[in-house]
Amino acid sequence: MAPNFPPIEEALPLHHDLFYDGKWQTPITDSRRETLNPSTGQVIGKIADASTTDVDKAVEAAHKAFLSWKKTTMAERQGYMRRAAAILREHAAELALVESYNTGNPVAAMVIDAERAANALDYFAGLIPMLRGEVLPGPFPTEDYLHYTVREPMGVVARFVASNHPFMFAGARMASVIAGGNTVIIKPPEQAPLSCLRLAELLENVFPPGVVNILPGGAECGQALTCHPLVRKVSLIGSVATGKIIMRNAGSLMKQTSMELGGKNALIAFPDADIDHLVRSVAAGMNFTWAGQSCGSTSRVFLHDSIHDEVLARVVEVVRKGFRPGLATDPTTTMGSLISKAAQDRVLNYIASAREEGARLVTGGGMFDDLAGTPVEGGFFVQPTIFADVTPDMKIAREEIFGPVMSVLRWSDESELIRIVNSTNYGLTGSIFTKDLATAQRMIRQVEAGFVWVNDVCKHFLNVPYGGIKDSGIGRDECIDELFAYTNIKSVNINLGGATHLGSRLSQAGQISNT
């Protein structure tokens, strides 16, 4: 059954301020920034812009809350998180509507995001009992010493979420942090903060004050969070450029980071692939629904010479028929806009460079698609675009575009294929299409990526680690490793008595030191 979407006026957040310490707070300087509807380019309103002083106050509140939150029992923490999950499911339609209104993503495709965020909250609530240490054997009899470890929360964690699925990332990525006994400050994307503010309204009375905080803002807010001494870890879903800035700042303070960054992901098709399934997957893997704005998009498609022409022609047909750009809040829209005018200009510049470098434009290439219906005037739309005859040296084959542009490359030699696939600085995902298990296993071992699909694209599975290598990131999400990443391990040694005579013996054996 189709969701019952409320009028947009009823779904939008009432508050446009900062949310911390369990209250809505006016920025110290009352600084505001405009936020837009990308489908139309029109201003929705002005949102609070957190300053360094605001960040200081929010971090102090989060740290104060941490001192109590870390002492909550497993059952208490699970109760808070499961209540939050239930609220997200209850308000899925309105969250999707706000999200689409402020991101340009089609509302019909965004409803599932509330379920994904709620599932993550339930999942990590269930993993809280795994926050246990180990009893470890030492080099000498156990009657002399007891060795064990404990896992402890880190403190205040800052999580920066991306503009393609803001409230989903906010809800899902806070889960591991608070499950681990930490408090969290979420920085929404500056282009699209509204769904995160609505999320704060929904959770305002769920968690104790200061446990979950949401600070909209720009570069000053991000810099202040990264460099604040009481913020123990910083996590980003975003661009490589932003990730490197955060890592430099955090590294100077010996602060831990977790990064899910960009991708230039390869879809590799062998001659024996199921052609019908391959065609559908190539079209789906580019994530044209949200205008290609996904770090996991399979934007480089490597088609074997023997199937290249047939697959390319059929993919073009599917894309032309399957993606109808339009107003994001219209449930019949199947392709959204880009997030901003700057993003639209960037994508169009990549399209221009591809033409200049000799790639063959097969479909798209402009700001809207007459075959699929003209989007709303003023929106930041770009047609679903496919280039063929792409060579590895072209910009569109090497750099992440983060837009609806697919590069199709022809291949025949497997060793050369692998060299080209691995020639970028990215390593997030890869897809391999073949019916032969030996071929799949051979390619899995050779493709440089943190996550590889075989005969599939773009799917995430809770409890299966997701993340990249090389410039695509550090750390793994959506699994128990994500939970552990927001804890510290403390090692404990207890002298059980009567073991003082061991000191000289152990020192002589080189098995202890006094450093």
Curated annotation (Swiss-Prot):
Q: Which reaction does it catalyse?
A: an aldehyde + NAD(+) + H2O = a carboxylate + NADH + 2 H(+)
Q: Where is the signal peptide?
A: none
Q: Which UniProt keywords apply?
A: NAD, Oxidoreductase
Q: According to its UniProt record, in which pathway does this protein act?
A: Secondary metabolite biosynthesis
Q: Does the keyword Disulfide bond apply?
A: no
User: Is this entry keyworded Protein biosynthesis?
Assistant: no
- EC numbers listed for it are 1.2.1.3
Disruption phenotype annotation: Leads to the accumulation of stipitaldehydic acid.
The record's active-site residues are E260 (proton acceptor), C295 (nucleophile)
- Residues that bind NAD(+): G238, S239, V240, A241, T242, G243
Which principal EC class is assigned to this enzyme? oxidoreductase
- Residues passing through the membrane, by range: none
Q: Which InterPro entries match?
A: Ald_DH/histidinol_DH, Ald_DH_C, Ald_DH_CS_GLU, Ald_DH_N, Aldehyde_DH_dom
GO MF, one term, reads: aldehyde dehydrogenase (NAD+) activity
User: What does this protein do, in the record's words?
Assistant: Aldehyde dehydrogenase; part of the gene cluster that mediates the biosynthesis of the tropolone class of fungal maleic anhydrides. The pathway begins with the synthesis of 3-methylorcinaldehyde by the non-reducing polyketide synthase (PKS) tropA. 3-methylorcinaldehyde is the substrate for the FAD-dependent monooxygenase tropB to yield a dearomatized hydroxycyclohexadione. The 2-oxoglutarate-dependent dioxygenase tropC then performs the oxidative ring expansion to provide the first tropolone metabolite stipitaldehyde.
Q: Which family does the record assign?
A: Belongs to the aldehyde dehydrogenase family.
Output this protein's name: Aldehyde dehydrogenase tropH
Q: Which species is listed as the source?
A: Talaromyces stipitatus (strain ATCC 10500 / CBS 375.48 / QM 6759 / NRRL 1006)
